[in-house]
Amino acid sequence: MSILKVHAREIFDSRGNPTVEVDLFTAKGLFRAAVPSGASTGIYEALELRDNDKTRYMGKGVSKAVEHINKTIAPALVSKKLNVVEQEKIDKLMIEMDGTENKSKFGANAILGVSLAVCKAGAVEKGVPLYRHIADLAGNAEVILPVPAFNVINGGSHAGNKLAMQEFMILPVGAENFREAMRIGAEVYHNLKNVIKEKYGKDATNVGDEGGFAPNILENKEALELLKNAIGKAGYSDKVVIGMDVAASEFYRSGKYDLDFKSPDDPSRYITPDELANLYKSFIRDYPVVSIEDPFDQDDWEAWQKFTASAGIQVVGDDLTVTNPKRIAKAVSEKSCNCLLLKVNQIGSVTESLQACKLAQSNGWGVMVSHRSGETEDTFIADLVVGLCTGQIKTVAPCRSERLAKYNQILRIEEELGSKAKFAGRSFRNPLAK
């Protein structure tokens, strides 16, 4: 079924910034997709086109991206009469029309908005759920429900506290199914709220951009201690493990790292990559830490490689790999990490996201599907994570409805699959292993 009409508009994300929404019409109806955006962005990401008109939305408007869709992409897709099930063909056409390495002509936010809407339309055209259509596009015969990684303590660029490391997460790997994982996550979250309130006062339980708490602590170890405490109080010490997203590029200073980067600059307190690696190893020794994302700067390749070889845990590349097949290939050959963080808006199309995922999986890596800090009510990544069988999803604390929208969609998928539902559980790093 061909595309009859495409119309884009500016809407708002969860931080009150404009973002792109696309309506795509076929004879089967209307298909709508909205594009997320990130706060800590890697320098190798596809370009998110903003207007930079300071008189409007502090320069963050996306009217140019919207115009590229309405005036250029839409007429091309309608006139070519492409079938919406031909995801790769449509994505390729948009990428070729853009003609730049990083999608800077139309903007990755323009191309992705259309790409997501096409994918939703393709599923209905085939008469299958979106997760099944995505599984077909990826060549997966089965689908798997992921372990949720709840980011419950926020620091770094996401929070106004002193904490350098950006995210402290809980993963309920011992749950029987996704619904139980959600219950465990919610109960630990509420216990954590009480633990923080008792120790730091009620105002320490205000939530950040991503629904997590941002108590004013400086020591990263203190965040782990709070988590351990809350997990124990909830009664789930045997079922919940911990993950971290350090986002170390944010505090990388000329070859070293500044764990107090939100205070006035003082080079005497910077630490070396080796000292930082030893700090991580002490966390792994003293707490159930099983996954660390972006432990070093996006260009500190040597530190990544040394750490991945010796840490014995999941090491996730986000700023390092930015969902970009070229960066992933380099990281694979250098053994820099062993898990890809998959963000559809870092690369800017469904087809390239699937390629990045398959490239990582075929090299024995894990893959974690992720939201962005500026989210919308769009639930595409819920179906994506199930269809791609990655076994793990990061869309933050069980708080704020733009986050819960994703979790609730996975609950519905689990219910729909019934007895066929498979939950990744403790195999979250490689759920397809036989």
Swiss-Prot record:
The active site is at 210 (proton donor), 343 (proton acceptor). CDD domains: enolase. It is found in: Cytoplasm; Cell membrane. Its cofactor is Mg(2+). The keyword Transcription regulation does not apply. It catalyses: (2R)-2-phosphoglycerate = phosphoenolpyruvate + H2O. One of its GO terms (cellular component) is phosphopyruvate hydratase complex. It is an enzyme of class 4 (lyase). The keyword Iron does not apply. The alpha/alpha homodimer is expressed in embryo and in most adult tissues. The alpha/beta heterodimer and the beta/beta homodimer are found in striated muscle, and the alpha/gamma heterodimer and the gamma/gamma homodimer in neurons. Belongs to the enolase family. Glycolytic enzyme the catalyzes the conversion of 2-phosphoglycerate to phosphoenolpyruvate. In addition to glycolysis, involved in various processes such as growth control, hypoxia tolerance and allergic responses. May also function in the intravascular and pericellular fibrinolytic system due to its ability to serve as a receptor and activator of plasminogen on the cell surface of several cell-types such as leukocytes and neurons. Stimulates immunoglobulin production. This is Alpha-enolase. It comes from Bos taurus (Bovine).
